[in-house]
Each structure stands twice: as C-alpha cells, then as structure tokens.
Amino acid sequence: ETDAIVHLAGKAQDTKNESEAAEYFAVNTGLTQKIFDYFLETSAQKFIFFSSVKAAAESVPGEYLTEDAAPAPKGPYGESKIKAEEYLLSKLSQAEKLQKKVYIVRPCMIHGPGNKGNLNLLYQVVSKGIPWPLGAFDNRRSFCSIDNIAFAVEQLIVRDDIPSGIYQVCDDEALSTNELIGLITESSGKKTLIWK
C-alpha cells in the first residue's frame, strides 16, 4: 500500500538549448498527467509534484518570488512545467473529493553533492582559480540545499495539517554570485578572485 507519490521525473532544462520543445511537453506535462491520473486511482493520499520556480518566472523583480505571483514562464521548460501544474490544479477538486492532497513544489536551484548544471560550472571555474569577471553586478539568487528540500518533502508526507497547494521552497537567505563565489573559494581553500 502506498501513502504518497513523489513525482520527480522530468526533462531538465537544457543549458545547451539542443532539446526540442515537444520533448519538454511530452515528459514534463504528459508524463505528469499520466502519473497523476494513476494516483487518483490508487490508495495513496498525497501527490507531490516537483515543478520548478521556472514555472512561475524566469527572473525575480524583487528579492523573493511568492506563490501569489502570476506565472510568467519563458521557454519550453518553464512552460511545460506550468502546463503540468495547471492540469493538477484542474483536477484538485476531484482529488479532494477522494480525501487526497496535491502539493506542487517549486524549488529554486538545488545545491548539494553531485550537483549539475550552472552551479557546477561556476564551481569548476572558481576552483580552477579563474577570476570572476562580473563582480560589479549585485545580483541575488535563492538556492535550496538538498537537505532543506528533503525536509520539506518529509513534512508534506508526515504531516496532515498542510493544505494542498503550491509551495516555493528555498533556503532562508538569497545570495549574490559574489557571496556564492566567496563560499566556494572558502570551502575549497582557494583565494577569491573577483573583478569589480
């Protein structure tokens, strides 16, 4: 017997822009619809879908993006994730009639062991001692540690007082790229080289 379904499968954002848009929609939207429809037929009481902050926005005008912000995804990755969310929300009343809960988790960039993507590229640049040429920009970005995302999912599973809905998950504080580089160099014993 299954208590919860945690849906993590999906097509990740392609940093090389080699993927066809249809691939994102087939996997991120179509597969989600199939898994959710299966969930409605099972004894599982909770469905946790890993969407992405990219379903809500490509960039954040203020310091934080809230769940109340009107979604404005850009590109097939974010657009396919928001379409999956819309499908789940369109079936929410059906799930609730069955006493089931539906959680849409929108994590920002997750960091931890084995990280891939842009954060790993930044780590490689910094750990090689290459100076960061964009130090004059004061950008801030939210991250989420793998430990924090695991804790959030655990709470969604074990607690019954959390209502169905959309939850954007991140660490407590946003970091600038310069602060992030400082943390990387400190942890790797390298000297921080930032051009301003």
Where are these predicted regions, by residue range?
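Mid/C-terminal beta-alpha module of Rossmann-like enzyme folds, strongest
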Residues: 159-196
